[in-house]
C-alpha cells in the first residue's frame, strides 16, 4: 500500500511539474516574409495562444529586447508580413481558424528573437487578444460593429487612430495597458485589474467600468451619457458623465467624475467619490 501511495504521489508531482520547452536564440540575420492567409476578424498572439500556462514561461522570451509588435491596418483584403531572425522563422506557426488568426511556435519552442514584428491587414477586426510578449498598434482608422480587446501579462494595446464601433469591450489584466485615443461607440465596458491601466478618449452613450488591484481607468476625455462603475483594492477611476452615474469605491480606492450627472454613490474602507469641476 505504501509503495502504491508513493507511486501515486510521484505521478501527480510529474504531471504538475513545468515542462521545459526547446529554446532557440535569434542569429541577428533579420528577414521579412509575406504570408498568404485567409481573411480574419480576430487576432490572438502570445504565450497563452500556444497552449502553455503563462505561469511557466513565455514562448517568446523578451529578455532585454524592445517590445515585440503586431501592427494592424484595416484594408480590402487579408495580408500578413512577419519580420524575425532567419533561423527562427521556420519555428513560426500561422493559422486562421474560424476567422481567428493565431501565431504560435512549432512544438512549443521558446524563441528569443533579435527583432519580431508582425504587420497584418484584414477587412474587419472584432477581437484582439495579446498576452505576455506582444504589443498591438493600430496603424489605420478602424470601424465595425463589435470590438473586444484583451491584454494580459504586461502586453500593451495602443490605438491612436480613430475607432468607430457600436459596442466595445476592453479588458487589461496583470500589468497591461490599453490606450484608445479617439473612440466613438454606443456602449463601452472597461475592466482593469492587477496593476493595469485603461486610458480612453472619445464619446459613448452608456458605459460600465471596473478597476481593481491597484489599477486605473483614466477617461476624463471620454464623455458618457450614463455610467455604472466600481473601484476596489487601491484603484482609481477618472470619468466624465453628463446624465447619470452610479459609482462605488472600496478598499482605499477613488472615483473622480466630471459633468452634471445625477449620482448614486457608495463608499467603504477609506475610499472617496469626488465630483470635480466641469
Regions found by a protein language model. Give the residues of each.
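Intrinsically disordered, low-complexity terminal regions
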Residues: 2-278
Amino acid at each position: 500500500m505504501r509503495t502504491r501511495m508513493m507511486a501515486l504521489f510521484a505521478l501527480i508531482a510529474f504531471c504538475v511539474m513545468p515542462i521545459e520547452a526547446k529554446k532557440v536564440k535569434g542569429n541577428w540575420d533579420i528577414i521579412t516574409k509575406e504570408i498568404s492567409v485567409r481573411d480574419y476578424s480576430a487576432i490572438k498572439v502570445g504565450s497563452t495562444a500556444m497552449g502553455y500556462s503563462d505561469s511557466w514561461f513565455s514562448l517568446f522570451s523578451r529578455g532585454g529586447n524592445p517590445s515585440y509588435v503586431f501592427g494592424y491596418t484595416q484594408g480590402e483584403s487579408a495580408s500578413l508580413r512577419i519580420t524575425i531572425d532567419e533561423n527562427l522563422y521556420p519555428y513560426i506557426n500561422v493559422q486562421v481558424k474560424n476567422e481567428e488568426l493565431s501565431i504560435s511556435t512549432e512544438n512549443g519552442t521558446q524563441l528569443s528573437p533579435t527583432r519580431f514584428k508582425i504587420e497584418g491587414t484584414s477587412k474587419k477586426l472584432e477581437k484582439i487578444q495579446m498576452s505576455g510578449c506582444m504589443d498591438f498598434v493600430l496603424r489605420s482608422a478602424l470601424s465595425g460593429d463589435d470590438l473586444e480587446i484583451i491584454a494580459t501579462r504586461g502586453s500593451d494595446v495602443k490605438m491612436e487612430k480613430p475607432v468607430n464601433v457600436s459596442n466595445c469591450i476592453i479588458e487589461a489584466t496583470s500589468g497591461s495597458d490599453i490606450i484608445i485615443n479617439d473612440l466613438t461607440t454606443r456602449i463601452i465596458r472597461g475592466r482593469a485589474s492587477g496593476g493595469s491601466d485603461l486610458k480612453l478618449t472619445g464619446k459613448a452613450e452608456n458605459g460600465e467600468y471596473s478597476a481593481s488591484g491597484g489599477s486605473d481607468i483614466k477617461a476624463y476625455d471620454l464623455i458618457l451619457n450614463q455610467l455604472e462603475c466600481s473601484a476596489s483594492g487601491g484603484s482609481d477611476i477618472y470619468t466624465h458623465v453628463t446624465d447619470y452615474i452610479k459609482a462605488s469605491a472600496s478598499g482605499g480606492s477613488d472615483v473622480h467624475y466630471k459633468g452634471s450627472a445625477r449620482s448614486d454613490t457608495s463608499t467603504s474602507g477609506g475610499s472617496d467619490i469626488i465630483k470635480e469641476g466641469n
